[in-house]
Amino acid sequence: TGSSNLKKFAAYLAVLVLFSCRPLVTTFDDIQDAVTFTSASKTDEPTSVDNLKVMTWNIRFGAARIPWFGDSCGDRVLMTESDVIANMDSIVSFINTELPDILLIQEIDMSSKRSAYMNQVQYILDNTYFNYGAYASMWDAEIIPSAGLGKVNVGNAILSRWQITDAERIQLPLRTDQDDLTQYFYLRRNILKAKIALPITE
């Protein structure tokens, strides 16, 4: 029954809390350092810039057109590794065609079960000409019970040809129309702010 299943899940959560070294859900300070990344193989940084091309893209955690349950357009919850790699390679190909200097990304996954635990920030860095990245999570949970979603870490990222410094995650207000348990497991939206060392002489 539903009541029995709820009790079993509550007991499962209690065991996780007792024996886990980290909380089920990561909470954040109002302002804290973002996570930074570097490409495994850096490319030469442009030493001058006449026109700066900035692109923004919600990559939907590499799901492409997969009918995902969370968008109310299907019933898929988890992708296979081959799904993720194929979709991420398409994203990488588009980036390498458009050649933005700075890329602002929304809904990029880091070690989430639904996207085969891929570090998508590092994957894009290592397969494009971008040298530096900064990441701010908006949803970092060891387990999300909905539909077997499991471990989730998704957020915003900035990728750049040039050095990124002073990257900060700025917490936005949480929703106030949810009960405490729902709010605990829900998104923690944020602003990702950073400085980029553009080759501009004053």
Which stretches of residues belong to each language-model region?
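Internal, well-ordered alpha-helical segments in soluble enzyme and binding-protein domains
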Residues: 120, 155, 188-192
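N-terminal, active-site-proximal structural segment of metallo-dependent hydrolase catalytic domains
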Residues: 20-153
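Residue-level detector of beta-strand structural context in well-folded domains
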Residues: 43-45, 157, 192-194
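Active-site catalytic loop in hydrolytic enzyme cores
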Residues: 162-201
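Bacterial Sec-dependent N-terminal signal peptides
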Residues: 1-33
